[in-house]
Amino acid sequence: MAIWVAIILIVIALIAGLIGGFLLARKYMKDYLKKNPPINEEMLRMMMMQMGQKPSQKKINQMMTMMNKNMNQKM
């Protein structure tokens, strides 16, 4: 009977470790992306120029605000 208890405890510990690791990794990535956003104003300016648009500061600010708003809603 002791072997079954040991096996059950090992399985429970593995599941708890997987869940804990997932939650810690998720929190770390959210914090990382908040501190280091994947796109910045300079990248937006370059993208708009490549698409043939003249990037005004107003357009860039609007796009950054929209992206930040969407990112905050997803979190």
UniProtKB/Swiss-Prot annotation:
Its main location: membrane. GO terms for cellular component: plasma membrane. InterPro entries: UPF0154. Pfam families: UPF0154. Keywords: Membrane, Transmembrane, Transmembrane helix. It is a single-pass membrane protein. The keyword ATP-binding does not apply. It is found in: Membrane. The chain crosses the membrane at residues 3-23. Belongs to the UPF0154 family. This is UPF0154 protein SERP0914.
